[in-house]
Regions:
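Conserved ATP-binding subdomain of kinase catalytic cores across diverse folds
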Residues: 2-110, 115
């Protein structure tokens, strides 16, 4: 997605949690005021550095002309309380969100260049 498309998606609040995923960042699938997405919060088991890595990696990919998903960083105020997969609560502060798009989950069984 182009940088201009990033300006059109601005989640600011979590309306409903769909699922807390068992991933390193403990991403949460959620419905936001801007639609369905995936949100990474402070308080995840990998620490805040994983959110910084996501931000930098996405910016670099965009600069290199690679396709990136729509994303937005917003301030999560701690409400509603969101329980991460590990059982801990998401902490208030910056949250990384990515718009949900339809696609498929790569199992890893087939080399990615054959997809």
């Amino acid at each position: 997605m182009s940088a201009s498309s990033l300006l059109s998606w601005h989640p600011r609040t979590i309306r409903r949690v769909v699922a807390a995923k068992d991933t390193g960042s403990e991403v949460v699938e959620a419905v936001t005021n801007a639609g369905a997405g995936f949100v990474k919060f402070l308080g995840n088991k990998e620490g805040p550095h994983i959110l910084a890595a996501e931000f930098i990696g996405t910016l670099l990919a965009g600069e290199m002309g690679l396709p990136i998903l729509d994303w937005h960083v917003f301030e999560y105020d701690g409400f509603p309380e969101i329980r991460l997969h590990s059982g801990s609560l998401a902490k208030a502060g910056s949250a990384w969100s990515t718009r949900k798009v339809e696609g498929f989950v790569w199992s890893g069984d087939v080399p990615i260049w054959r997809l």
